């Protein structure tokens, strides 16, 4: 080639020498001598393409381009690239701009690629062909995609002028890249054009071919040629036995009659890439065959069959002499794609999809492993119902597709709002052009899980709506758990009998409910051939999203949002009660409230999911995921606490739970009138946690390799493996009592830092050793070492602080635990006192032999072997104090234990205040929590109520202390108030165990209706009840106005306190009336307050408001009815109209009338002063005096007053309202 030129530039000479070396090494057959003719042919081919655009640039050779082999691409090309031999830089820039404003175009590399186009991946047998295309040279094979394939190109050497190469993703180290061939390849050797047939090919057209199938018995062994237009092309189906596809030929497009042909010869599978709907073809040497397991017969290709373009001059229709009835038989027409809207069965919720063809561009990748994409920015595309593994690698924004016989589903639900196109096996997805954009940087969750998603479709047989929800749910789960808890490939791995997929296990409860296992397996032949068409996409039901898996941070934020959205001071303090509260009480009542949210409160319902961890900083259990952690309170079941530490590190899934939001508010509302003004709220914060029963949850162990490979933030607390430490020693102990978790001071050991230590979160445990120390032997524990003394009950005081605080929630009295110390055996490890944190005197008083500090690396296991069952049975019950000990003045043992239901929880002032609280100092009001509880006791029908106070350092209270919850209190301190009421306080020895959560639905139980005499029966009477009685007389009536800030009397709306510095001059009314009532069995003095006074006086709201307005002038009116007449304790005169009105009203039948009274005892059941005995009282009956024993009058507080059914009319005063 060089002989034809006098001089060759050195650069061209060097380029030609490199080209010759490359060609001889890469393209020439290795078994032959170097082919000297191949080099000039390749150079001429390159020059022809280089000069095809009329660009010379001073050289006839592309000197800036270099040859690249398949191996070089696979080894050295790490980034996606493209190469366009005939393009200038400006042409490439124009091409790249078409990638779109947000697209990232493929970078250009100046590379020359040559190779043989083949459908064989290697030098293998013909049967190994699966329809894929490859580019091959001497260095290797690389898979490729081509838009329009000419079957005559196979096996020939080509120059590829325009192509792009996409290397395997970084996460897929074992994968291979692929080529995208944009233009038709340029042959190095001229292609030989096969001459047409000498004689016309006898062919059958679809009508005759369909009729001929009826004569299958006469056509055995006979092969025919079929001709027609391609009207349908199925997907390429690959099963374990073989791969195949089915095409349908018709006379025209759209066709009235069609005939189906199965292509399953391996060498013919590549036809699938060459076929184009609407093009006419001839298929030669077809035979009639029956599909195994099917009734119908079909045409099928043979080994010698060929695919030819239909040329009318080269074919001749074969005339067949068939029987008349067969010719008259009307073959089944091909159903046409419907243009109507989705059909909807009016009698059900079943919808029918539309079947159509569509061409569009991919504008987004929604979930590549799941086969979900976006088309034209407005449609969804789901390829999961086809086997699209080969197509997945080219699918990215910018790819143009032609969809044949694709299903359109609208309003599928399940969180999907856009219409979705989904091809089944009958449809075909054909490439029209490749994307100019680089593949996106896929995250790990977008790269793994293809086999799991296929399992959902092909094994679980999910319909499209449920499949779309499942893919979304798996994405949510991957975001929650990967990669810190699990690796993506482990979470989304294929599920098998020996290795279940964790992702599928989390979805199984929902999937089993909506799509029970056992659905019929898809039959590919029926799905493609059967008429009418049946496939999983044909019918569907709109799916109401069953649930979602929010991150714990999202769940927490949504709970807080709902809690504060529902926070309404007016609802928490409804009128008329709030209008009588002074500012301090008003703000204290608003200071704490709570909200319980069930999963059904969210739309869709939320599923709780996280890894259970034990916090060593707070001593509580937490659920943790990628977004953070959420405190949780778990019970194994009702009245059974969580006690198995092996649950740490497990994945917990719960559909039934309570999301608790405790609201703490610091406010300065002057009065009830300003409750609607949020500006008076100074600070608000919330404590959010969840509580649920372990029996309602799904517990899944997380594989240990996943945890060890996680980052340091992994919630791993157990340093040992699942079989425990290989070396170590342990000892069993029975837990007798657990003290409160609180900050305590510890002694500083000698030689420690001189700095004053800060209080550390800790707790103590009192227990008894069961046997001696045991050493690790294999996977079990050896025999206990003999003890020096014969006392089997060796008490021990265990101290937990630092990291060992994490065991707090698992330790409960009455259980036997194994304390494990890893590492080499150390003599007397569990006997010696390794710390000086506690003095010997308390240990001696408790009868403890030793004090032991639990080290950070020690672990605990719950022991439940048969050897200790007797010990567990003997210590199973919780300690309970008798009701007599609780409600008595006996202080022999001031520590009491009992179970109770919490009735209310409020904030109150501290029990002991060293200094007077400053007015308005709301911070001081927050230092004490009062729980009013109803004791659980079988000694009386109506459980007595008791107040339990929690003060620092036990604040904030532990989780779960909510109204409606059942709780066991152990070792509370019993006290007696100055008014002789028994109450209890938390001490450092107090242990609280939640027995059950508040009920999800509250049922209002009416108060019992009793006679007043029943209240004289002591403990057998209810604390609150209803009685029908009659008001006999009024003892006293007080009406006054006070300052809402300092509660001093207000006259004419002004505070009368000396030196008043009240920030607001808001006055509120107060009212108290004392009545004498009787029901024929006993008498009672009833105290009514505020708005209940209006009901007692029989006044309507308007009259009551007018009366209070009149009282505002003097500020205070007190009427005493102990003697005759009324005494006015105010500046007003006795003969004033208001005084006369009140005196007349209180002695009129409008007040002295029958009523239905709801009340509670003024004397609390916890009061220990004995009841007043009956007294002698003189009665005068005419002239005769009588002496008789009379029971003391009951003292009641009014809860409500209703008019009796037998009450007479209230007269003019009431009727005027």
Curated annotation (Swiss-Prot):
Compartment list? Nucleus; Chromosome, Telomere
Residue ranges of the TM segments: none
Q: Name one Pfam family in it.
A: CTC1
A GO cellular component annotated for this chain's UniProt record is: nucleoplasm
Ranges for the region named Disordered are 328-347
Output one GO BP term: hematopoietic stem cell proliferation
Q: GO molecular function of the protein, one example?
A: G-rich strand telomeric DNA binding
Top-rank taxon of the source lineage equals Eukaryota
What does the UniProt keyword field contain? Chromosome, Disease variant, DNA-binding, Nucleus, Telomere
InterPro entries (alphabetical): CTC1, CTC1-like
Keyword Isomerase, does the record have it? no
Q: Which family does the similarity line name? A: Belongs to the CTC1 family.
Related disease? Answer: Cerebroretinal microangiopathy with calcifications and cysts 1: An autosomal recessive pleiomorphic disorder characterized primarily by intracranial calcifications, leukodystrophy, and brain cysts, resulting in spasticity, ataxia, dystonia, seizures, and cognitive decline. Patients also have retinal telangiectasia and exudates (Coats disease) as well as extraneurologic manifestations, including osteopenia with poor bone healing and a high risk of gastrointestinal bleeding and portal hypertension caused by vasculature ectasias in the stomach, small intestine, and liver.
Q: What is this protein's function per UniProt?
A: Component of the CST complex proposed to act as a specialized replication factor promoting DNA replication under conditions of replication stress or natural replication barriers such as the telomere duplex. The CST complex binds single-stranded DNA with high affinity in a sequence-independent manner, while isolated subunits bind DNA with low affinity by themselves. Initially the CST complex has been proposed to protect telomeres from DNA degradation. However, the CST complex has been shown to be involved in several aspects of telomere replication.
Quaternary state and interactors: Component of the CST complex, composed of TEN1/C17orf106, CTC1/C17orf68 and STN1; in the complex interacts directly with STN1. Interacts with ACD and POT1.
| UniProt protein name | CST complex subunit CTC1
Q: Which organism is it from?
A: Homo sapiens (Human)
Gene field: CTC1
